[in-house]
Amino acid sequence: MRLEAGQVAVVTGAASGIGLAMARRFAADGLKVVLADVEESALEKAAAGLREDGATVHARVVDVGDRGQVLALADAAYERFGAVHVLCNNAGVGSGAEGRMWEHEPNDWKWAFEVNVWGVFHGIQAFVPRMIEAGAPGHVVNTSSGDGGIAPLPTASVYAVTKAAVVTMTESLYAHLKAEHARVGASVLFPGPHMLRTGLWESHRNRPERYAKERPRRTPYRSLGQWESAMKEAGQEVEFTPVEEVADFVAEGIAAGRFWLLPESEHSDRQIKARSASMLERANPAYLESFILD
């Protein structure tokens, strides 16, 4: 679909990182933007910044894991602007799980699934029927990750499982939209191709009490800066992709009607080929054994 001034874009996880970058890009193209995030102070700051730049903004505190709150977000967006043309289900969290899978706390899985999987489904259910009924061109972008969306990083297995689910959900959504002959498209986003400076590393700051850790962590949470410093001390330079480049990539992908919003990357291509070859040859997933798991 063609992005045009006056259209409306809804972005979850919009207070920072990729979500805020997408909102800024849409606003720069003249779209009205609806920002949703669970973090109120950061959301207010993001909305104020966009308004200062001349954007038309509606901001709402939303926990995407709560179906009722996402339905209320849709009601508010349609009441305020009368239409929604672009939906970016972008909110996501890292689970904070430690150790082997059988050592994980159930709450790590429950929280990650509530936001990363149920949050995407809630967005689809709240907005897509109205977008189809409107009959205007529209597009849905669901944020996945190379971790899980392509192949799992075993040291972050909970996150990987949720992001694999997002890929399959979006493939199914694409097929359902085609079956309805809808003018609404769908894409799955793999942010990158390199590391990104986002708040995902500090997801625990927004962890709700209902999914509190049952026991103290064996190691303290590390910020992105701490991890980057540790990598440098180990002699490994980390390359980063600016979130603004991701936002540009999304806007270009929507305009081109691309399903796979997967930036070119030799590393990603190797993973895809290795996993596909393993399946086609009915071979064990040896490509996972190269990861350090301790």
Q: Where is each model-derived feature located?
A:
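The beta1-alpha1 cofactor-binding region of Rossmann-like NAD(H)/NADP(H)-dependent oxidoreductases
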Residues: E40-S41, V61-A72, P106, T143
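Conserved amphipathic alpha-helix within the SDR
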Residues: A47, R51, V57-V61, R67-G82, ...
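Substrate-binding pocket helix/loop in short-chain dehydrogenase/reductase
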Residues: E98-M101, E105-K110
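Catalytic loop of short-chain dehydrogenase/reductase
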Residues: V141-A165, T170-E171, A175-A179, G192-M195, ...
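Canonical Rossmann dinucleotide-binding motif of NAD(H)/NADP(H)-dependent dehydrogenases/reductases
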Residues: R2-V34
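SDR active-site lid
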Residues: A179-L261
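Active-site loop of short-chain dehydrogenase/reductase
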Residues: G6-Q7, T56, A83-V84, M131-S145, ...
